Regions:
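Sec-dependent N-terminal signal peptides
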Residues: 7-16
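Short, solvent-exposed loop/hinge segments that bridge or flank secondary-structure elements
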Residues: 31-70, 101-109
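Contiguous, well-ordered beta-strand patches that form the walls/edges
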Residues: 64-106
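Edge beta-strand at a domain terminus
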Residues: 123-140
Length: 140
């Protein structure tokens, strides 16, 4: 009897993990709007990002990419195209090191059904870090 219960437990866990992965991979499109954020300068000065009405739309392309459908501009498009994403349960976690002109950025994102949290570390320049929170919904 003990082996039977172990088999059932392992089967249920495997099925649960598989369903979480399929859930993220099958629901592919998100629309996100800016909620809040801030930057940190070299001297430690924190500056709030001004709230806009802009929203962006992106589509997850398994196994690890994001297709920007609507963005704020070419810089955001390039960042999204270079990010590599990994599904973890119902969340997508992305990262990239991006070179834009003379800037080198380390970018990370955690994307869920409800929000996106993006962090950017700047290699050079006056601005050293940026954190941005966005409200997101799955639209497909």
């Amino acid at each position: 009897m003990s082996k039977f219960y172990k088999f059932i437990t392992i089967s249920v866990l495997f099925y649960s993990i598989l369903m979480c992965y399929i859930n993220v991979a099958s629901a592919k499109t998100w629309q996100c709007s800016f909620k809040d954020g801030w930057t940190l300068n070299q001297d430690g000065t924190e500056t709030s990002l001004s709230k806009g009405t802009f929203y962006g739309t992106r589509e997850y392309l398994p196994p690890d990419r994001m297709l920007p459908l609507q963005t704020h501009g070419p810089m955001e498009t390039q960042i999204l195209e270079e990010m590599v994403y990994q599904p973890v349960a119902t969340t997508l976690i992305g990262h990239a090191v991006v070179e834009i002109g003379s800037m080198t950025l380390s970018v990370s994102e955690t994307l869920t059904d409800k929000e996106s949290i993006i962090t950017v570390i700047f290699h050079d320049g006056v601005t050293k870090a940026l954190v941005e929170r966005n409200l997101c919904i799955r639209i497909e």
